[in-house]
């Protein structure tokens, strides 16, 4: 049996007899994700589905992100890397983009944000209707006030900081940005108890 990869994100699983004359499509191969954003020290498990045999995982830039023989990616330092998987019955390889951003403390984040007050003065219009401001992350694109929060986040946490969601108030910290009714975004400067 062999796997033929049509695109980096999806493979076609084919079965063939030993002389390669009778080939049949029997399924598809895929990875659980093709784009990962991590902070330094964090990990993400990659999985290759629909293949058999021993798979080989490799990082294009082990100084930025490593991957072990089971597909566990670890963020080492800020930058970009490509994680590829090959072997087994996979012909070719499949890849996942990894962006790593730096680890930063809440105190450092607040200090960096406050240092930007001269650049981002109060009273500037950063509404969603103002399409002049655009920002893009590895897993998000936006305009207006979200773009402002994204731009500040890039300067505080690094260009490849992940856009994540959580609903646990205790996890909110300086540097997080909060969406209010899907209409407006604010940047957290400091957390005091429940405010």
Predicted regions and their residues:
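Basic/aromatic-rich interaction segments and small domains that mediate binding to polyanionic partners
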Residues: 195
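Secreted/periplasmic proteins that engage bacterial cell-wall peptidoglycan
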Residues: 105-192
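Extracytoplasmic soluble-region selector
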Residues: 3-103
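Generic detection of intrinsically disordered/low-complexity segments and helix-coil linkers/edges
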Residues: 1, 28, 40, 51, ...
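Generic recognition of cysteine residues
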Residues: 2, 48, 96, 140-145, ...
């Amino acid at each position: 049996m062999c796997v033929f990869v049509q695109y980096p994100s999806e493979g076609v699983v084919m079965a063939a007899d030993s002389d390669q004359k009778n080939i049949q499509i029997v399924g598809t191969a895929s990875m659980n994700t093709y784009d990962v954003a991590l902070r330094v020290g964090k990990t993400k498990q990659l999985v290759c589905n629909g293949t058999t045999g021993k798979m080989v995982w490799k990082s294009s830039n082990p100084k930025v992100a490593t991957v072990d023989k089971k597909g566990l990616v670890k963020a080492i330092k800020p930058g970009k890397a490509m994680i590829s998987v090959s072997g087994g019955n996979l012909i070719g390889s499949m890849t996942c983009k990894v962006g790593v951003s730096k680890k930063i403390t809440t105190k450092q984040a607040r200090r960096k944000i406050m240092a930007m007050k001269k650049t981002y003065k109060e009273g500037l219009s950063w509404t969603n209707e103002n399409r002049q401001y655009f920002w893009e992350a590895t897993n998000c694109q936006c305009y207006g006030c979200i773009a402002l929060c994204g731009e500040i986040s890039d300067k505080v946490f690094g260009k490849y900081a992940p856009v994540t969601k959580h609903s646990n108030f205790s996890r909110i910290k300086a540097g997080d940005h909060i969406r209010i009714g899907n209409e407006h975004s604010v940047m957290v400067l400091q957390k005091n108890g429940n405010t």
